[in-house]
């Protein structure tokens, strides 16, 4: 198949979110079933957003420095493969915290990089991103089924399949073209942050986002455990 074809861009979006769903939808349920309590589950699941605070700007900076969001994405996703293997065979709190937080933080950080690759492609980004939603939905349902029918650990095998496939797809797409500008604007990071946090509308936006996404994330984290506690199955969690 021709390099940088629509199929590779669609495949990147599909399998990226396909793999992402394995952890995002099923992590809390898995931790509950291996006998972690609510406090331990919240500690593990809340660590990912904290890791993301540092991972997202760092990977963005690396992508700009090396002018290759594609290469940065490949390295980051390869690290998630290694972390996933460690996560699969560990039941120690600190190891599960570090590995799961690293995986989810890197996926959060790679999301804008893959979007950047898709936007710069010769294809309609909406038609590329649509496949990400399809991949997430299919994976969530599939993970629920194999969780019940085979074994809970099987969802991490699905993650490996999705991540390795998205690595192959990213290898077959092109980096965004770098547009050189004649004039370079020099600015101080300190001054930029200072002016940003003096912007009242920006602060209000941050507060709204904080409470909105905090509530959504709390609900999304524990809904799987709640469904299981009232007699539901992992398949129902995947459907939700």
For every predicted segment, state its role.
Residues 49-57, 136-137, 141:
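Residue-level signature of mid-helix packing/kink "hotspots" within the transmembrane helices
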């Amino acid at each position: 198949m021709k390099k940088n074809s629509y199929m590779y861009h669609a495949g990147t979006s599909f399998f990226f979110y396909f793999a992402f769903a394995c952890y995002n939808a099923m992590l809390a349920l898995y931790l509950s079933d291996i006998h972690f309590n609510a406090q331990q589950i919240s500690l593990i699941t809340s660590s990912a957003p904290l890791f993301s605070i540092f991972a997202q700007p760092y990977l963005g900076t690396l992508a700009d420095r090396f002018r290759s969001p594609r290469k940065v994405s490949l390295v980051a996703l390869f690290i998630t493969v290694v972390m996933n293997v460690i996560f699969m065979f560990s039941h120690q709190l600190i190891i599960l915290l570090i590995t799961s937080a690293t995986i989810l933080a890197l996926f959060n950080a790679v999301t804008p990089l893959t979007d950047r690759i898709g936007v710069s492609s010769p294809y309609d980004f909406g038609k590329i991103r649509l496949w990400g939603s399809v991949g997430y939905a299919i994976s969530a349902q599939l993970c629920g089924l194999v969780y019940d029918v085979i074994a809970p650990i099987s969802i991490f095998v699905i993650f490996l399949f999705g991540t390795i496939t998205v690595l192959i797809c990213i290898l077959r797409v092109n980096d965004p073209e770098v547009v050189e500008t004649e004039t370079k604007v020099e600015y101080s990071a300190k001054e930029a942050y200072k002016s940003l946090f003096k912007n009242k509308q920006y602060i209000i936006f941050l507060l709204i986002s904080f409470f909105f996404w905090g509530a959504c994330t709390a609900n999304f984290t524990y809904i799987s455990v709640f469904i299981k506690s009232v007699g539901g199955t992992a398949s129902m969690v995947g459907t939700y």
